[in-house]
Amino acid sequence: MSSWYDAWADRYGDWSTGVTADVPFYVGLARDADGPLVELAVGNGRVAIPVAQATGRRVIGIDSSPAMLAQARVRAVEEGVELDLREGDIRELEIKEPAALIYCPGRSLLHLPTWADRRRCFERVAASLRSNGRFAWNAFAFDHHLASAIDGQHADTPLPHTNYYSVGDNRVDST
């Protein structure tokens, strides 16, 4: 999975600049959290940096892409915030101190290839949270009407991947 993100890392910053609608939600959760903050699929720090700025606290960021983590490190220094950035697979999350908040913005959980992968991620998150900790993520609501209009191969995306929408199978694949 990381090779695709490594290849896209240089363009992600430009694309993500205007993607901010979810940031206040995660900032609010982080302000209410009393303990460690962990962002899964931290990417270039799009959400982690504003969370760290708003809370004045360090955010642990996990990502499988070295190129994205390198961008997050540069951006964190530029913004004067502390991020503890770690290369890793969110399906194998391990942190020493249980977290008060673990969050995964940007529909990143949907990038895990199988339901078993998502389940494994949820299991690791549950094992990594404090007893009163929270896990927050977002996902899109599948729209059958929209998908049926573009059912089959959709190859005109600006990124090097293909989306496949199959209404009959109730699935959306990104490869």
Predicted regions and their residues:
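Conserved class I S-adenosyl-L-methionine
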Residues: M1-G43
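Class I SAM-dependent methyltransferase SAM/SAH-binding core
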Residues: A48-E92
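A short acidic, Gly/Pro-enriched loop at the edge of an enzyme's catalytic core
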Residues: E94-L101
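A conserved beta-strand element that flanks and buttresses the S-adenosyl-L-methionine
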Residues: Y103-P105
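A short His-aromatic
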Residues: L110-L112
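A short glycine-rich, Lys/Arg-flanked "PGG" loop and its adjoining helix->strand segment in the class I
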Residues: R119-S131
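SAM-dependent methyltransferase
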Residues: A136-T175
